[in-house]
Amino acid sequence: MSTKGKVIKCKAAIAWEAGKPLSIEEVEVAPPKAHEVRVQIIAASVCRSDTYVINPAFKEGLLPVILGHECAGIVESVGPGVNNFKPGDKVIPLYVPHCRKCKFCQSPLTNFCTKFSEHKNPIIEQELMDDKTSRFTCKGKSIYHFLGISAFSQYTVVKDINLAKIDDDANLKRVCLIGCGFSTGYGAAINDAKVTPGSTCAVFGLGGVGLSAVIGCKTAGASRIIAVDINSDKFAKAKALGATDCLNPRELNKPVQDVIVEMTNGGVDFAIDCAGGSEVMKATVDCTTVGWGSCTFVGVNVNDKGLTISPVELILGRTLRGSSFGGWDVDTVPKLVSDYKNGKFNLEALVTHTLPFEKINEALDLLKQGKSIRTILIY
């Protein structure tokens, strides 16, 4: 029986309160409206960004909410005006929209879109659809969306400009990682930092994003990749993916940036911060060489005050830039999927656990405890 145009009842993990476990509930998912697509989620992964809104220290989050944004699925139905998707298409929802019409979409300099850049904080400002209503209801109460995706539901509704259509034979249980973590780190290295062959690099933070940045540096031909994390258990994985050296700041007798400068005769060519926080941001800057050192910032910490920097550090030739989703968009993500299929990079190494969707709280605990890189949730 067709579900097109009808409300779908399904299971979703709802965050009712900050600091509390998610609750598996039956939700009602409304049909897609104009330029919207309803997607059946097949597989998703847990990203640290999913935990920000339910962190008691984060005061701006809107609850109740269905979290999740790193996923892949199949189109169930489309709303009026949707011409580039049809039921049965395999897709990856993206938190970065791409309208193809605005000045950002038409520029080769960014993957931003007016629909994205108008948000001061996209983590909390894509909580409703364009008509300022939600497509989710539970127990008669409207439930907020998250990053325009809400992957922790068996069905979700997203805007068509937030969807990438991918190959029919794509393995959704792996390419779901391309929805955020892998693309963010890998692209930060090859698209935004533009790591060059023979260069030296430092990567701070060895979660899914940081390890993907290591893969990106290796793919770009870096001769030395220094991986930094306070969890030494991640070093074996980092070296397997291309890191030449690993440093734990807690095991050093001087600041890690000073050690890196000594190791590289003056500092690395490229440094990528995938951890966030003022201390790590400062170390990222300080570990790069004067003259041409490149600093790329990817990581975000809840309520962190950010970086304070002297103009002299910039006058000496360093460049600083931010990176969002690694420079990819809905038009370039399909090529990433093809590259994975053709063996250009390995997503398997990032997957440490696979769990049924109902065990989502276990997946979140593994992430918080530093025991997982990426846990795949199977719906």
Swiss-Prot record:
UniProt KW Metal-binding keyword: yes
**Any GO BP annotation:** formaldehyde catabolic process
Q: Where does Zn(2+) 2 bind?
A: 99, 102, 105, 113
State the free-text cofactor note: Binds 2 Zn(2+) ions per subunit.
Q: Which UniProt keywords apply?
A: Cytoplasm, Metal-binding, NAD, Oxidoreductase, Zinc
Which SUPFAM superfamilies does this entry report, sorted A to Z? Answer: GroES-like, NAD(P)-binding Rossmann-fold domains
Lineage: superkingdom: Eukaryota
What are the names of the required cofactors?
Answer: Zn(2+)
Query: Transmembrane residues, as ranges?
Result: none
- Complexes and interactors: Homodimer.
PANTHER family per UniProt: ALCOHOL DEHYDROGENASE, ALL-TRANS-RETINOL DEHYDROGENASE [NAD(+)] ADH4
The name on file for this protein is Alcohol dehydrogenase class-2 isozyme 2
Provenance organism? Oryctolagus cuniculus
Source lineage: Eukaryota, Metazoa, Chordata, Craniata, Vertebrata
